[in-house]
Amino acid sequence: MTRLRTGALALLVSVAFFGCGDDGPTDPPVTTLTLSIVSGDAQVGAIGVALPAPLTVQVEDQNGDPVSGTTVTWSLASAAGPNSSLSSNSTPTGTDGRASVSFTLGDAAGTYEVRSSVTGSSATFSVEATASGALSVVSGDGQVGLAGQTAAQPLVVKAVGTGGVPVPGLEVTFTVTQSAGAGAAVNPAVATTGANGEASTTLTFGDANGPVSVRAVANGSTADFGVYACGGDASAAVLDLQPGEDAVVSGADLACLQLPAHAVGAEYEVVVTPLPQALGFNDMTLAIGGSAAPSPAVVSGTGAQRASFSLFGAGADLTGWRGPQYDWDTQLREMERPLRPSIRANAVSGSSFGLMAAAPQLGDVMDFGFSCVTQTQFPNTPTDITAEVVSVSNNAVIFEDTLSRGAFTAAEYDDIALNFDNVIIGTDTLYFGAPSDVPGDIAPGQVVILYSQGVNQMTEDYTNGFIAGFFCPLDLGFSGGNDAKMFYLLVPDPTGDLTPGNDANLLTKTNVLRITDNTVAHEFQHLINAQVGTGAAEEVWINEGLSHLAEEVVGHAAGQVEGLTDFAPGNELGASDFLQSAAALEVVNKWYLGNWVNLGFYLDAPGDTAALLNAEDPLGMETFRMRGANWSFLRYMLDRFGDPATEWQLTRALITDAATNSRQAVTNVFGVSFDQLAAEWAAMLVVEDRDDLGGPVRASLQTTSYRMRDIYDNPSIGGIASPTGSWPLMPASRVLNVSSSLNMDLFTATSSYVTLRANAATGGTGLRLMETGTGADVNPAIMPYMAIVRTK
């Protein structure tokens, strides 16, 4: 026991000794660890699938330096469902202080939490498992490519889960389920979705033209691609056109057209025109099958400064005034349609025009109703007009509103009447037929022309357009009418006092004379048509087209009176003819320019308007564009099928044809289907008067009355008549050897234009017209026609 006590005492002494010493050893410093998340948090994946990115943490000491060799422990803190797993329960940190683990989501959708920890510190990851990962097509669907070649676009799908969240890490299997030929394949057959949920594969088409279907499958979800091989099929027919040759294709042939191999510089013009029975928009896509390259930008025209060659002189613009006029005309034609049987009956029961001698005399005063005009629509207008006879000729009686006395001098009124006798009536009756008196006609054998400020008052602001004059069908023997073949025309208003807008200097006497002569020629056709027209002649589009033709052919007659002997159908008038003299300019301003302005609007945007068959433009512009198209179509048919000396027989036949619709009437009179004519007229517009063609086009794709490009390209005329200042039709541009497409949402009987040009040698090209979006064949009810002209 003594030794035990001695030993204990010795130990105590020893401890005391070392405890009191100044240079003895110290305890090692304590290290504090901090763990933080680096990446992998907030991931989303499909149930049962490993997350695409590992869960990564970093361990640092109290100085912020990475700590290597430290063990990080991993554990599942919470789970939405069973069977989730970690690749390891512990991992050491590397030299960068980082440690990672992979995590596979469980079998239920929801939140999973994984806890990472080291001594004294921890961090928790929260990730999401989403149900199924539903597939949808992202891109590549509906494309067209060459048989045996790789598709220009990859086939891309996207997997999304609950709430539309992308699902990465999902295996997607791609399979060709249909092919028109052998050898169709996808590569890779299995692809994994990336962080954006997308997976893709590349398709090689089979060796034959036709549809190809590819299905993508993942986790029981499917997505289907429908694409088409067109072009490069050695066993299929090839549309081999030489420069100058053309073809008009319709029906099932539009599913795929093969063009041959081409050298650099080969060129085609392609014009697509839908001609269904129903009026409406028709959504289609023209697909070009070529090599894999992006589509070039669409070519568009550039505007040019307008010249001073204008109806209203320098600094003023012709194009606006006709808007209200055209809108009012359309309303009157719609009012007229149900009255036409009675109008014709009244014309038959009345006296023959021109045979009765009794007529109003100079100085006679009469009261007129302001027919067809309501104060509800035109609140500033009168209900009745008192007017005095100021001029009488063989065929015209001119009245002047007593409130507008002195609008013109007596000599000027006589000139107006003589112009009607010598120019307007002879031409209009030759082309469209003779009018008839109505029972109780106030001017038997003559036309009444009433100048009244009431017409001015139908407009509130001249600068926004105005109504120059009109013919009211109620005057042809109906209650509320005046029992006369008559026209209402505005009067000069140089100070603008007759409208609330007070627009001075627009309606000068000179301008009104220019406008009203043209208006009478236009409205006289409507009057004649109402009395003698049958069947389809009542349709607004063809009725208005004929009235615009009246402006033109009366202009020819006016030119002849002025000694302009070349102003006649078939003479291919060009800019130099229009600008040859002051007399020519006056004729062009008065009679021709309106039609060229209207057509210029149409050519500037043919795919953005209505053209043939329609009563009004659904996209606005007060029917400027469609009226230009209507006139051009009629002039084209007269040039193609008529003789300059006898073309009037065709217009008369068109007015009196008994067909119940205009399509059939056109077919009956011209002997070619309306649809074929409409497609070829549209093609004519893109090749007419071109001097850069590689070969002459057929005569039916040309006009004989005008050199259209020459007229528009002249800055003095194009500066007014064209929105671009020159030739306005600018087709979209695509490359023959490049896979691309062009969407077309076209109104019935309206066209879309595209130029196809080879910028490199090509082994062949395919053209397919298809439904937009689905890539399916176009619905046959749309009745599309495709005119193709090889230009180089």
Labelled PLM ranges:
Residues 394-539, 543-546, 550, 554-560, ...:
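Juxtacatalytic substrate-recognition/specificity segment
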Residues 657-792:
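Beta/coil-rich, acidic/histidine-enriched accessory regions frequently appended to metallopeptidases
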Residues 537-629, 656-680, 684:
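Acidic/His/Gly-enriched intrinsically disordered linker/tail segments
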Residues 234-411, 415-419, 423, 427-430, ...:
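Zymogen propeptides/activation segments of proteases
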Residues 20-234:
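The feature marks long extracellular or luminal low-complexity segments
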Residues 8-16:
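Bacterial N-terminal signal peptides
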Residues 46-50, 96, 146-150, 196, ...:
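Solvent-exposed, conformationally flexible loop/turn segments
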Residues 1-8:
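Bacterial N-terminal signal peptides that target proteins for export
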